Amino acid sequence: MPFTLGQRWISDTESDLGLGTVVAEDKRTVSIMFSACEESRLYARSDAPVTRVMFNVGDVVESHEGWSLEVKIVEENGGIFTYIGTRTDTEEENVKLREIFLSHQIRFNKPQDKLFAGQIDRMDRFALRYRALTNQYEQHKSPLRGLCGMRAGLIPHQLFIAHEVGRRYAPRVLLADEVGLGKTIEAGMIIHQQVLAGRAERILIVVPETLQHQWLVEMMRRFNLHFSIFDEERCVESLADATNPFETAQYVLCSLDFLRKSRRRFEQAQDADWDLLVVDEAHHLEWSEDKPSRQYQVVEALAEATPGVLLLTATPEQLGRESHFARLRLLDPDRFYDYDTFVEEERQYAPVAEAVTRLLSGEKIDDNARKTLVDLLSEQDIEPKLRLIESSDADDEHAQTVRHELIDSLMDRHGTGRVLFRNTRAAIKGFPERHLNMYPLELPSQYKTAMRVSSMMSGSISAEQKAIKLLYPEDIYQEFEGESATWWNFDPRVNWLLEMLKANRNEKVLVICSRAQTALTLEQALREREGIRATVFHEGMSIIDRDKAAAYFAQEDDGAQVLLCSEIGSEGRNFQFSNQLVMFDLPNNPDLLEQRIGRLDRIGQQRDIEIHVPHLEGTSQALLAHWYNEGLNSFEETCPTGRAVYEAVSDDLIALLACEKHEPEALENLIEKSAAMHHELKAKLDQGRDRLLEIHSNGGNAANDLVTQISSKDGDTNLIAFSLGLFDTIGLNQDDKGENAIVVTPSEHMMVASYPGLPYDGCTITFDRETALSREDLHFISWEHPMIQGGIDLLLSEGVGATAVSLLKNKALPAGTLLLEMVYVVDAQAPKSSGIGRFLPKTPIRILLDAKGNNLSNKVAFEGFNRQLSPVNRHLASKLVNSVQKEIHVLIAQAEQEVAKELVTVRESAQTEMENSLQAELTRLQALKAVNPNIRDDELELIESQIQDLTGYIGKAQIQLDSLRLIVVSHN
């Protein structure tokens, strides 16, 4: 390379160094000083990774003194360029600027500048950049954004609720599904959508203390949302960074008790400007008109100060009407201002729900029901619709459509339809059956002796303490024998468990017991006696260790056959891949029993659940098993009445459990009384069901359509190819581990020091939803995952693939024929929270010009064209660019005219789509406001101002050249 002192060069590998100056050279080396960052580099002269900087006529260059010059003439003397032209500030002509006096800070940010400066990237990177832009655009435009990327099964009612609520601005809703239907996942999906759409940047989740870690893990594992748990210690630590500790994190998780106990922390939380508040277990907030609880007041104040609120609660039937009203009051105190008015309103909707039940079941609609429907939908003539439904076959497609139109209209007018979602198992299909297998086993003599001696020595303990003690004879035995007691050598439940596991070698078995020590002892017994692979899961383990245990259990090959859990194993972890549940002992209340079964009996479970209950005859264990089974039927069915019945009969039950000898008659009477109460309460709950609300909450066909649409996107080969190309370009190591899993780790040759979303020691990823669901240690990669979103942002911001030169081997065209491919981006500069991404995200426009300026982009698709091209080495690429620089300038100018026309079309299309969408919603809500007071004024005002703001942003959208590729036809 010919180097001369004073010449200006740029580094090909370190473009951020700015403009360099040759300060020394000899036969073998050259030294270049980069004054902008006060660094110098010594290169081997023969292959220095630098490019000569030469500006052309028409360019505007900056001097080191800060003034700019529009170049008219370029002169060269002794290898040094002098630029002659007009100063832009004083308009003085024929000003000379020698290249040594150019600004050191000049960087080549425009693609054409990079191309002319020889900063030419690889062809595959250009293609990757274009794909990144098009995929990013498609994801922003997708109505399913925020729903496809979560690590969860595709459950219709969950997706429907999340889709319905997640697209609203500042949603304020009550999620009141029955247990096991996935309220936490629904809330997570809503949060995820709000975050991706930019509607929620600051989120506060308030939960009972025991559920903090569960929520932390769920949000991180399922939605890649990283929350921080705030307690007193964290608040004190944060004081160094801010006066209000809650302003030091965007996503905060804390316990309700923490805010209740400290007025100062509560006030700080209240002042922290949240966009979205989520409250779990909201049914525990006690309220009465004259005396609301402190917890209720805390949530009420936070809800008042926060635009969006999600309350997760028990079903309205379980809550009772007054308590249900108190939750609604938190969401909209202006609308739900008086309890008696609310009760009267609810009463008026009862005949509507009855009419809808008849409508759906195909029963004849009597005159009363018909009158109810006609009165409520007075603004439309529904008589023809009713006649069509009654005269048509129940499966007739047109009649089905009309049915759903009627239901949608009714739902919009329903008292709480917009703010309350509630699904019941009775209304949702897809739950497996539960089969109970009871195994009465003989009580060992060792236990008999220990229990007798313990009874003599226990003195005056309460009946409740005694009852609990008698449920766990192994603990009583251990009290006398000490730590070295080997009760597992003679306990028949252990022998039964070993035989059961040997008989079911290919099954994954979940064993739950009340205490951590029991789980640890059983693991030792299984290992030492039969070499059975087992793992434990208890409260003494860290979250990471629990994750590892769960992953070991989930592993198909070489995984554990058994997971031994203490009671916390039935909190928040789901193991749907197993259908075998062993209860080594029994919990002392029905809610915990349901929680245990709920680890396997969840929506999405594919097989019937086998519940195994080994119990020692004549003990409290046996008595409790019979009461659960015959009094509540809580093994084989979910039991919404369990707590109410338990509280009513608990004195009698505890008295029986505390007896060493059980009277069969007393047990019989208790079971009879409990069963009668259970059936009576269940009938009442069933009668109180609001069929209209159920129909709305489960989403019907719309919910199934969502599942179909998302399923069709799962396993997208385009995503897999793009992701692997992205990781390769950034410099990540990839190691295929089989079983749909790839290990991704950082390398020494990465483009950046750390990669977004990738732990420093790497991670294992999968593109398969089912694999991700069965193995919690894997990251589920989708277009929404931080590793992909962050990778695309990195690729675009670092200018990767902004320029390229390729050869087209085509003998049908003359050799040397020139083509220029340019990618422009339409960008509306607007806050993310405005919702611009839904209508006008960054939009790529591809222009492919031949040498005559004809635009071939509509005739020549990108991928097919790209496959016909060959790469060119950088040295040859620079030569080609320099030889046709004038032609490229002309083509870029022609492309600007072409893309200006496209910009008008893109703006008009975005404006029309925005108006159609938002204006339709505004018109609908304005019409409904007359018949449904649940429509809030601020909702209408928000849509009106949004239409106005978006119109301004769309009208000001600009274009920018993002990347370009020179293509030269070759016959070689």
From Swiss-Prot:
Q: Which CDD domains match?
A: DEXDc_RapA, SF2_C_SNF
**Position of sequence motif DEAH box:** 280-283
Whom does it interact with, and what assembly results?
Interacts with the RNAP. Has a higher affinity for the core RNAP than for the holoenzyme. Its ATPase activity is stimulated by binding to RNAP.
Among its keywords, does the record have Nucleus? Answer: no
Name the Enzyme Commission number(s) assigned to this protein: 3.6.4.-
Could you give a GO molecular-function term held by this entry?
Answer: hydrolase activity, acting on acid anhydrides
The residue ranges of the Helicase ATP-binding domain are: 164-334
Per its UniProt record, what SMART domains does this chain match? DEXDc, HELICc
Keywords in UniProt for this one?
Activator, ATP-binding, DNA-binding, Helicase, Hydrolase, Nucleotide-binding, Transcription, Transcription regulation
Please give the start and end residues of each transmembrane region. Answer: none
- What is this protein called in UniProt? RNA polymerase-associated protein RapA
Q: What class of enzyme is it?
A: hydrolase
Tell me the lineage of the source organism. Bacteria, Pseudomonadati, Pseudomonadota, Gammaproteobacteria, Vibrionales
Q: In which family does this protein belong, per the annotation? A: Belongs to the SNF2/RAD54 helicase family. RapA subfamily.
Signal sequence span is none
Kindly give the InterPro entries that the UniProt entry links to this protein: Helicase_ATP-bd (IPR014001), Helicase_C-like (IPR001650), Helicase_RapA (IPR023949), P-loop_NTPase (IPR027417), RapA_C (IPR022737), SNF2-like_sf (IPR038718), SNF2/RAD54-like_C (IPR049730), SNF2_N (IPR000330)
Q: Which residues form the Helicase C-terminal domain?
A: 493-671
